[in-house]
Design a protein with these regions (language model features):
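Short Pro/Gly-enriched beta-strand edge/turn motifs at strand-loop
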Residues: 8-11, 47-51, 252
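Short glycine-aspartate micro-motif
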Residues: 14-20, 56-58
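C-terminal, non-catalytic interaction/recognition modules in large multi-subunit enzymes and RNPs
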Residues: 5, 13, 23, 62, ...
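Active-site rim segments in enzyme catalytic domains, especially the processed small/beta chain
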Residues: 37-40, 55-68
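Short beta-strand scaffold segments in enzyme catalytic cores
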Residues: 26-30, 65-69
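OB-fold/S1-family RNA-binding modules
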Residues: 95
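Basic, amphipathic juxtamembrane/active-site segments
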Residues: 29-52
Length: 362
């Protein structure tokens, strides 16, 4: 979704930070040069699974994240969540602990007169009561300051999550645009971007279902792999060519099984490479035609050094490079989803309403 909406807004560089802030979590992923970052393996609840997946960094910061003050007088937001039921205190469903949503309501970012589709109306008095008991009184602050501190703490956690995937890896987030999704993102995306130095934020109309739209609009794809261990100084070209031929045949069978027209098929090649004695490999893109170069091993090694330097700001160009696995991603481009064009309408003169809002920085 992030890549699609950035292109719709005229971005071709494809350097995108996608964020999704829902009720319980804040998810971050970084797209560089229109390429999705992939994990060779991931973890769920501490359990490692060996299935390649998109690299997503998740923290427990969402609209339902509960704010609390510990025994030492320090404010924390999340990872515990009020969930949908009972939900934030302002939902009037029995919840009595303050959340980010309650803080947004108290700060004027949410309209207390708005009635949701199921008839629910937000309760400011309940949000004030929860905020006063659990945050304002323990910190000796008024309710506006307390709500502002909850929002500030939550946003600082989200800034740190983005920096984990950018600054701490030598990537300058100021060179990226942000595509924000999730039901709660609209209240925080601009503040987060301003803190990091991102100059452009895209908040799609369907931000609340951004992830679901991405699945619906994504292309069909499947990855295949062959293990051929070799080094760039002594490349086993015969075994590699045999493996690539098998991978191409598997890919064509997969795409044919989906009835993907030939003109809508594409193959994305890569290999898993590392310096000797390194524990983790890097995914190195390549083209099968690279094997026809005068010295294909040297070509792959040089590209690996460049990739390593771009990710970690260092490379050992005198070291040999090991390649352990050869991969192909078979992609079948599906019919583009055409979003309806909405013609410009007539805006009524004057604001729909006014309300007080609290901003810490003012």
């Amino acid at each position: 979704s992030g890549r699609r909406f950035s292109r719709m807004e005229g971005d071709e560089a494809g350097n995108i930070i996608t964020v999704d802030m829902g009720g319980t979590s804040f998810d971050v992923s970084i797209i560089t040069g229109n390429l999705l970052p992939m994990h060779r393996e991931g973890t769920i609840a501490g359990h490692v699974f060996g299935v390649p997946s998109v690299e997503i960094h998740t923290i427990g910061s969402g609209g339902g994240s509960i704010a609390r003050v510990d025994a030492g007088g320090f404010l924390h937001v999340g990872p515990e969540s009020a969930s949908s039921y009972p939900g934030p205190a302002c939902y009037n469903r029995g919840g009595d602990r303050p959340t980010v949503t309650d803080a947004n309501l108290l700060s004027g970012y949410l309209n207390e007169n708005f009635v949701s589709g199921d008839g629910m109306k937000l309760s400011r008095p309940l949000a004030e009561k929860a905020g006063a008991v659990h945050i304002a009184e323990p910190l000796s602050k008024d309710i506006d300051e307390a709500a502002g501190l909850v929002i500030f703490a939550c946003e600082q956690d989200m800034v740190a999550a983005i920096e984990d995937l950018t600054v701490r890896r030598g990537v300058d987030p100021r060179e990226y645009i942000m595509v924000a999704g999730g039901a709660a993102a609209g209240a925080h995306a601009v503040s987060i971007a301003r803190e990091i130095g991102i100059k452009r934020v895209i908040l799609p109309k369907m931000a609340g279902v951004l992830s679901a739209f991405g699945i619906l609009a994504g292309d069909a794809s499947f990855g295949f792999a062959r293990n051929v261990a070799t080094t760039t100084s002594n490349l086993d070209e015969a075994s590699i060519r045999k493996a690539l031929a098998e991978l191409q045949a598997e890919s064509e069978r997969f795409l044919s099984g989906l009835d993907v027209a030939p003109e809508h098929r594409s193959l994305r090649w890569s290999c898993q490479a590392r310096y000797r004695a390194q524990v983790w490999e890097l995914t190195l893109p390549f083209d099968p035609a690279d094997l026809d170069a005068e010295d294909p091993g040297a070509l792959l090694a040089q590209r690996f050094h460049e990739l390593h330097r771009s990710l970690y700001q260092a490379a050992s160009e005198d070291e040999d490079v090991e390649i352990t696995e050869w991969n192909v991603l078979a992609i079948g481009k599906l019919t583009d989803i055409q979003l309806p064009d909405i013609s410009a309408g007539h805006v009524a003169k004057g604001p729909a309403g006014t309300r007080k809002a609290y901003f810490r920085e003012l």
